[in-house]
Regions:
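Residues that form or immediately flank small-molecule/cofactor binding pockets and catalytic motifs
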Residues: 153, 164, 188
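Serine endopeptidase catalytic core focused on the charge-relay Asp
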Residues: 23-24, 28-36, 43, 51-158, ...
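Charged/polar, solvent-exposed surface patches and flexible loops
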Residues: 17-21, 150, 199, 205
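Protease-domain processing segments flanking chymotrypsin-fold serine proteases, especially trypsin-like
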Residues: 1-43
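C-terminal cap/linker of serine protease catalytic domains
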Residues: 180-207
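Catalytic nucleophile loop of clan PA
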Residues: 40, 162-185
Length: 207
């Protein structure tokens, strides 16, 4: 069977209609006023988070007490207090950083949600159509359409979809329902959806 037979038909137009409201879920991340990467806002169990790559924000920013700012599409600079360590989660092995957002009133935008099929086997996502919202060349937000063509036993996604270095930390979204299935990390993606209990790889949320 040809690969194309696996790709689900989708109404691209309906997806484009909601892109405008989703744009504010993507942010540039600045550390000490220097742009270093991309992140996105997501909602898990009614809690709001900033998710990005471990290669963009890691433990050293806590130790060095650096100032982290977010720049969203309406050009509003939002400061986030990251001094509460219990609300920051790192996973170096899978390259993920998650920061719980307390000041929800400061960020009035669209929070992305995790895909509904979090308990299905990883093979479920093979050949699924995806798109990636990203800041290309550190300028405007672009959307790239593609598909997943491989998932290895480390939950690394190999996809056919245009990205560059500035895409690291961007969300990988299921084209069918516009929900998160992964995050861009270097030259590959990380699948956030597991068949185990937690949708986040190796990360437990603290109540």
């Amino acid at each position: 069977m040809d690969r194309k037979d696996y790709i689900e038909p989708i109404n691209i137009l309906s997806t484009k209609k909601i892109l405008e409201q989703m744009i504010n879920s993507i942010c540039k991340i600045e550390v000490n006023n220097e742009k270093i990467g991309t992140g996105y806002f997501c909602k898990v169990n009614s809690m709001n988070f900033l998710m990005t790559s471990y290669y963009i924000i890691d433990e050293k920013y806590l130790k060095e007490n650096k100032e982290i700012n977010l720049l969203i599409n309406n050009n509003k600079n939002i400061k986030i207090d990251i001094e509460i360590q219990r609300e920051i989660y790192f996973n170096k092995e899978y390259g993920i950083t998650i920061i719980e957002l307390k000041d929800e009133d400061k960020i009035k935008n669209y929070y992305l949600e995790l895909d509904d099929n979090i308990y299905k086997d990883n093979e479920y996502y093979k050949y699924k159509s995806i798109y990636i919202l990203q800041y290309l060349n550190d300028k405007e937000i672009y959307v790239s359409y593609g598909y997943i063509n491989e998932i290895n036993n480390k939950n690394e996604i190999k996809y056919i979809c245009y990205t560059d270095n500035s895409s690291i930390g961007s969300p990988i979204l299921n084209l069918k329902n516009n929900k998160i299935i992964g995050i861009v990390n270097n030259n590959y993606g990380i699948l956030l959806i597991l068949s185990s209990v937690s949708p986040f790889i190796g990360i437990s949320f603290i109540a």
